[in-house]
Amino acid sequence: MSKHVEQLAVNTIRTLSIDSVEKANSGHPGMPMGAAPMAFCLWTKFMNHNPANPDWVNRDRFVLSAGHGSMLLYSLLHLTGYDLSLEELQNFRQWGSKTPGHPEYGHTPGVEATTGPLGQGVAMAVGMAMAERHLAATYNRDGYNIVDHYTYTICGDGDLMEGVSAEAASLAGHLKLGRMILLYDSNDISLDGDLHHSFSESVEDRFKAYGWHVVRVEDGNNLDEIAKAIEEAKADERPSLIEVKTTIGFGSPNKGGKSVSHGAPLGADEVKLTKEAYEWTYENEFHIPEEVAAYYEQVKQQGAEKEESWNELFAQYKKAYPELASQFELAVHGDLPEGWDAVAPSYEVGKSVATRSSSGEALNAFAKTVPQLFGGSADLASSNKTLIKGEANFSRDDYSGRNVWFGVREFAMGAAMNGMALHGGLKVFGATFFVFSDYLRPAIRLAALMQLPVIYVFTHDSIAVGEDGPTHEPVEQLASLRAMPGLSVIRPADGNESVAAWKLALESKDQPTALVLSRQNLPTLEGAVDRAYDGVSKGAYVLAPANGSADLLLLASGSEVSLAVNAKEALEKEGIHAAVVSMPSWDRFEAQSAEYKEEVLPSDVTARLAIEMGSSLGWAKYVGNQGDVVAIDRFGASAPGERIMEEFGFTVQHVVARAKALLENK
């Protein structure tokens, strides 16, 4: 292909981006204008992908971590033949379009990850690279490299200022993820102005210290130098950072190289001058020259041929390794093996076990029948009970290991989990103390937004943590996560509810699940022995009916359910008929029919007392105007857990007193 056509193809990306932002009167033109050459080079000369099948298993992954530059990605998707029409580019940032302001996974064909919150794209790419290495180590055989793709990312200065990218880059270097290549759009400009006001470190030295291969391209418009750098990166066994020096808003005579081109349309006059600088002789907006369209058609055809070659290889693989191939297909489709849950542990009345421990037993049981179960903890596996026994650690020396040591990198763990789930082929879990869920909350939010079935194991879920004190005792976290759309929060009351929660989490294909688990032992509840799965799946159920017509409902989740049962028994001795409702999952309960809700929370029983060792926020919906809540609306304290619970009123005596007061005030 001639240099002239290459330059024309690059400028087509630029002008499509400019025109789309201009028409929307909203957006970020500067980044696509500066980064177009590196993106063009990557997408047309290196990336293995088939626009006709965006879900090809062994495609190279591309993440635009600098998601504000979304028109760069949309232009490439359209030009290379993905199902994204020119009309969609013209409807950039409009209601109902496939071209939202920031890329959204599942919304636009070819978009691999929802990005925009800076830094997370880098960390998700690390997760994708981890998934690729694990699946390659698990399924590849001599002569059959069915998983051997690269993960490419384009990021900006803002991405590399974010802490999550530092956490993830540290992990990637440690794991020697050589199939991850990060192209850094280094333009020395941030939204507020020149970068030197806030960022002056040597990114090159920092990434070398992480264990990365680093190369610098001085001229971001030099396609040959960019290609040479990518070739070097592919040949290196370490993850690679390619710093490409660019000019934001390249070509704009008055706004190029300035922050003013970052997040606003150029304006009609500047657009005209910019296109003249590109020697763009076409008058129509959104114009694609014929020779450019013809070139991109060749790229599309090459992608189809690459997938066809892979399909032929996989057909041979299926003949040589039928069982392995079947397992691989099941995993990449997100399905579970037949009979996988037959190994589920169960607990009898009389046995006490912390839900973190029953969770660990469930995890280990299901790991035997679900080989794609993969994950770990942010340096708390022994406390979270998330070690898969008998399995190796995932490491630079053994990528087949299923136990991931994320280190004390909660945010990177959450984002990497998203990347693994986006990659496909794995059932992913990650763990930490519940109070530290705040550290990865932005990643949880993206998981919910992308509808990714990742599993969070959050242990040490209340003031019962005890001696570690208020820094480690969650109070507001439960209400906070319940407020997040699309996230299923399950706080099981005993071992059987805990196992049911794991089953539901593993069965999910389109929703993340947070398991909120106790540190302290909890008794096995008689009402949950045979009904835990059905009850947890519906979010709430009558665990212990009243002895006769109910005078009072006791509502609780997690460790407080056994307290409610004990309070019920004390009340019954005084002739007060109370029913106990276990409410492990509000979001699941809200999805039930009105009839079922009435069955669990009969409207004629207005005396309702909720019991939960967390914020009272949200309980009013269930207890009503005549109800009450035993909760915690202050921070905890440092003392033995039993003493703290007593001081905060989580005793049978206090609950009974509150219940009787409630009935007296009716």
UniProtKB/Swiss-Prot annotation:
Thiamine diphosphate binds at residues 68, 116-118, 158, 187, 262, 436. Pfam families: Transket_pyr, Transketolase_C_1, Transketolase_N. Mg(2+) binds at residues 157, 187, 189. It is an enzyme of class 2 (transferase). Its EC number is 2.2.1.1. The record marks 28, 262 as: Important for catalytic activity. The active site is at residue 410. Belongs to the transketolase family. This is Transketolase. It comes from Halalkalibacterium halodurans (strain ATCC BAA-125 / DSM 18197 / FERM 7344 / JCM 9153 / C-125). The lineage of its organism: Bacteria, Bacillati, Bacillota, Bacilli, Bacillales.
